[in-house]
């Protein structure tokens, strides 16, 4: 009883002490409330960003599952294709948990243009299957084309980052670009400085930025440079890229591909390394046996089912 009375007395004294100085107490309570709100908001924001990044990686880059020949993962050599492909495809077709899958060739190579070259990972894909599994086709920059929309040989899809590396992007100040900036709310006093550069083209972003820095103050560059770049950027669509890689016997081979589309996603590293060509074109150039597949990307109805599907596939 004495303990209960003491506890009640302490609580009573504490409550009175809180409101003895109302201003101080309100400041402390407000600080605690704001701190909690800021913490909850930050955690929610970070969780949302992580979820978006994971979703983007699954939908554009990795899918829910990938099936490979174990030796291909260890050595990355062309001859290590998936064994018993027909049986595996039959199994995937019968599993209700499997939403879609895409069979691919995959190999390392070099992409070359007259302006530059870069190492790339080349995927030979079936466009119809690829659309069912990944969303790259939804991320093609509008003015650059489509995702294998034309029924022609030797088309290639590349990322925006790789297009920059290969000098397939230029910047041109046109009347249309100036009008676009005006509509976007760029002040006339800023736009007037661009008048002397109308119809001038810059071969790369470095040259373009250098010229902009000569014309504008640091503050104007901070506020408007991204708008300048977006309004004046254009792509050398339909340009040719020469891909070189090893064929099935280890000899260097290659072919010239015409750009069918340029994709843009949140992962610039992926954009700079991964290119897509038609399965039949890559099979022909590398002299791989018909039906060869290095990986099968699988999209499930529910990612939680991945362990069960893996067990079923391995048991077969």
Model-predicted segments: where are they?
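Short, flexible turn/loop "capping" segments at secondary-structure junctions
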Residues: 33, 114, 288-291
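Alpha-helical membrane and juxtamembrane elements of multi-pass inner-membrane transport
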Residues: 8-12, 16, 24, 47, ...
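N-terminal Sec/SRP start-transfer signal
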Residues: 2-40, 50, 59
